[in-house]
Amino acid sequence: MEKTNRKIGIMGGTFDPIHIGHLILGEAAYEQFGLDEVWFLPAGNPPHKRNRAGRAKDAQRVEMVRRAIASNPHFVLCTKEMKDEDYTYSYRTLEAMRKEHPGTEFYFIIGADSLFYFDEWKNPERICAAAKILVATRDRAKEKELLACMERNAKKLHGTFLKLDTPNLDVSSHELREWIREGKSVKYYLPDSVISYIQEQKIYQD
């Protein structure tokens, strides 16, 4: 029987590829908010990223996440969105999780950059009804602006927005894909298990 009153963090993303920034963010959320687990949720067909040319296949993205989190007992791979044939939306996923796991409190992790257009997402008020929103801080100089936006969204969407303190790691999946194509080293930016898989599968090298 599933434990009730669990606190679960949800880390969604295309993870193309998953990198140390994602892992550090997940661990920070786990520690700061006393979570039981952090679920890594590879996106299926997000409406804003429909063009997958030059990217990893879905199965490859899943395998990279599996390898990246394998050594962490409180990190969990969740392939829920990969099973959805339709375009995926966060509110649908979170509402389905609430139904499947009653008594569980969900914490949806987003980056500070996403916060500023969060109210433009599909049904953001339903996301807020299904989960508390953890906002990862990045640029300390913009903290005042960030807190003001969190407060505005909380009032407008009737949600709970909480600040997640994280180191300012300037790394992106897009940049790492370019480096791999150019033959540059990505050591320490990606787990070794992910690097070896990318090399074996020749991902991003076209």
Name every feature range the model reports, one short phrase each.
Residues M1-D206:
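Nucleotidyltransferase catalytic core that binds NTPs
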